[in-house]
């Protein structure tokens, strides 16, 4: 399967980015370690699991090295990009409880939710030691996320107010634009 990744563009509608190869210079799980990501996501009730290096990743929508979601499990291999793990984790956080209950592979959601997922992904990276927001934005650009203003940084700093408002309205960030470490309830 081609490695296409949905990202907000122009009016924050999801679109497919260019296919990316395994050689993309992004942080991978093997460089960060499962424990760091699992610790970050524990308050969300997500269980992080690492599969074998040659195993297919259960629940991976895009296949290849992309992270997978099955119920409350975030699955990855050593070569899974950290941005992919955070992106899928943020889908879990942003989806409604009924979608979480039946979750297997396809996180679904609408265009506004996809924007919120990308925004929260950057915020959460700021809480991962040795990664931070800047590196996450660089990796998102390197992987092919596409935004109207060109770069993830430009979008995040100057064009993502609607994503932030969506997160605030659903109780997922506070007034200081910090994660609340809660799941969406409605």
Where are these regions (language model features)?
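Secondary-structure capping and boundary motifs in well-ordered enzyme cores
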Residues: 74-82, 109, 113
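Short, amphipathic alpha-helical segments
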Residues: 31, 111-118, 130, 134
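Short, mixed-charge aromatic SLiMs
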Residues: 110-112, 142-151
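Post-HEXXH active-site segment of zinc metalloproteases
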Residues: 59, 93-123
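Active-site recognition of the HExxH zinc-binding catalytic motif
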Residues: 83-96
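Auxiliary, metal-adjacent structural segments of Zn-dependent hydrolase domains
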Residues: 2-68, 75-79, 123, 127-128
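Pan-zinc metallopeptidase signature
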Residues: 146-186
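Short helix/loop segments within enzyme catalytic domains
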Residues: 124-140
